[in-house]
């Protein structure tokens, strides 16, 4: 097969380009599968009860306040976990980055993060705060490739 060894960085880039979540970054005990776009794995119409079932039923029926979305950057800087996300004008914090990398397939920096639901539409312009400067980005649907 001529396979070559690769490390965790390669795996992380591949999963991010595919839009797959990484527990500890994109998923945690502070987020729900519904917010992460994984509602298909939460079966709320079963008769048995399970931890957080009531919360998931409510989120499926009423919607969520934030949503995990992808974004593509217009700069060469790579977004990192915890960076703040602002609206297009940069005057309102609307979310945070969970994962980011340089995409070898797209040849641009990409990332995922949680956005307030009213800003979580593909095509929306946002800004990612990196250091003292904000960098323009565009919200996109997942997967990237």
Residues covered by each model-derived region:
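Conserved, structured C-terminal
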Residues: 1-145
